[in-house]
Design a protein with these regions (language model features):
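Signature for HUH/AEP ssDNA processing cores
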Residues: 1-142
Length: 145
């Protein structure tokens, strides 16, 4: 199994509606798990390059990626589509994000409700419809619920 993941650093319109001179920005990279400190540094640099008051997010893929499949698909796409060298990074990220290039099949639900009863019911629904035992379903509290 590979420790390769897709990372997305972005500043979205949705989060920055009232920020003067804001322009939506995003950067997608493919990184190994052991390079997470480098990704955090890139995140801080990306955020610092924004306008004052801009909110920036970092997303790390839940499922690791299969390097061999990514390499093969990238080579095929480079030959088939005659990709410009200026588009290599975005093409690599696009290939890496494809469902068939993941190593795992984990799910992530963003349940933005701060109500213990609703969270419990939601977890029971996930258990019921997926047949995944409750002991394998993890939950994490975030700033929004």
């Amino acid at each position: 199994m590979s420790d390769l993941y897709v990372c997305l650093i972005c500043s979205r319109n949705k989060d920055n509606k009232d920020v003067p001179n804001f322009k939506e920005r995003a950067k997608t990279t493919l990184e190994c798990k052991e390079n997470k400190d480098k990704v955090i540094e890139e995140f801080h640099k990306f955020a610092a390059d924004g306008v004052p008051g801009e909110q920036t997010r970092l997303y790390w893929s839940v499922n690791s990626r299969n390097e061999e499949k990514i390499r093969e698909e990238l080579i095929i796409r480079l030959f088939r589509d005659k990709i410009s060298v200026t588009k290599l990074n975005s093409t690599l990220a696009s290939v890496a994000q494809q469902v068939e290039n993941r190593n795992e099949s984990k799910w992530l639900f963003d349940f933005d409700v701060d109500d213990a009863i609703l969270v419990k019911e939601f977890m029971e629904d996930v258990n019921h419809f997926s047949n995944i035992p409750l002991r394998y379903i993890e939950k994490y509290k975030t700033p929004h619920g």
